[in-house]
Amino acid sequence: METRLDPVDVVVVGAGIGGSAFAARLAEQAPKLRIACLDRGGWFDRRDLPAHRRDWQSLAMTSWATSPNLRLGSGASACSADYPVDDTHSAFKPLMWNGMGGSSLNWAAHFPRLHPSDFVVRSQDGIGDDWPFSYFDLEPYYDLNDEAFGVAGLAGDPAYPAKKSRRMKPMPLGRLGSVAAAGFDRLGWHWWPVDAAINTVAEDGRAACNHCGPCQQGCANGAKSSTDLTYLPQAARNGVDLRPHCVVREIVIEAGRATGIRYVDGAGRDVVQPAATIVVAGNGIGTARLLLASGLDSPALGRNLMFHPAAYVRGMFRQELDGPLGPIGCALYSHQFYETDPGRGFKRGVHLQVTRENPLLSQAARLEQPWGAEAQRLLREEFRHSMAVLVLAEDLPEAHNRVALTDRQESDGMPGVRVEYRMSEHSRRSLDFGLDRAEEMLRAAGAYRTLRVPLAPL
């Protein structure tokens, strides 16, 4: 039997970064509105996070991996709301989390902004479409979001228009970051400490980062910002009805208009929630899945899927670095090659990001020779003696890259979902250019050996 609830003004599907920010801000600006925010997952108790366990490195590759497919494949996913994503025909793998806070629970907390040029790519570069507003129109909202998350950073980055001063100092560079910065300086290239949504000082009842490392399996001391610590408490204070463990199966369409949602709640009951306005914020895969499953048939729906194609170069150094200490993605970055240069043979540019080193078990797991005396030699040579430079490129919208439904029904009662993504020659050229620059920087920083990974399945 189906339960039909009283109507609300706005229902938000998804309590991740987008959905929770929207719900919290709307409730603040329009306190008389009746707002509900649902998520298929639940709340997580920080006492249960892997950082409290001695086997956290193993959990990071299995039940607490960033990919739902790896978590499900472990047979003991830490995220009970996971659903599989068929990525057989995709160059990249899904990284996402379902729960109150969404993927902000296991993100790396790097908090970059777009550049002014990103809003005018059609006018400037003849690709994609221009945005209907500019960077400077959006800038006040960037500032609001930075304030809500508590972004740590350093003002004055010459790659961007002037930003407001951060209320917290940036993450420390450490030995690894200092060595990388020296390499950029020798080449005369831009670099800057990352903006990170991580407390570098204790604030708002949350501790400062202690540089323990397992950020992507949830922050045990709450230093890393996630929306279960920021926007969702604000939303609750402002009267938003937060509903965990609600699997939304369908947008209800009546006479060509969306009138509500149909979902299964945590007790297994079928529920209809009528709403005047429906906001779907279930990430790029989950949103398309729900809309397609609801019978929407726009020819553009699910198509033109875009990632940031990624690759990286690792450099090995004679001196010991402090790579395993601190958030893996929050050392420093370079936008020396961010903008279009017609001489490169591709449009737009690349983002270079110096990342910290993986922990010991992860390092050992990816050795070319995984056992024996040679493995021990390689591990002694590489662990605490390496850094990586991640290359992120800008892909172009292509209709064949898409999210689609499968013929299989999953355990949540919805059709399965698959991702189809072929990397274009344009993306490959931009990644290769970035890999060349990353290797050049590592050599300038003193690396005696480098190793290219031409495609990182992020």
Kindly give the residue locations of the regions a language model identified.
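Short, well-ordered alpha-helices that flank and scaffold nucleotide-derived cofactor binding pockets
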Residues: 24, 28, 233, 237, ...
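A glycine-rich dinucleotide-binding beta-alpha-beta segment and adjacent secondary-structure elements
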Residues: 78, 192-215, 222, 249-257, ...
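Conserved redox-cofactor binding core of oxidoreductases
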Residues: 61-77, 83, 87-89, 110-113, ...
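Mid-to-C-terminal "cap/lid" subdomains and adjacent gly/pro-rich loops that border
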Residues: 42, 48-59, 63-74, 79-85, ...
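N-terminal glycine-rich phosphate/pyrophosphate-binding loop and immediately adjacent elements
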Residues: 2-123, 127, 132-136, 140-143, ...
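Core beta-strand elements of the Rossmann-like FAD/NAD(P) dinucleotide-binding domain
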Residues: 5-8, 267-277, 281
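Reverse-transcriptase-like RNA-dependent polymerase core
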Residues: 110, 395-410
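Short beta-strand segments that buttress and anchor functional surface loops
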Residues: 261-265, 391-392
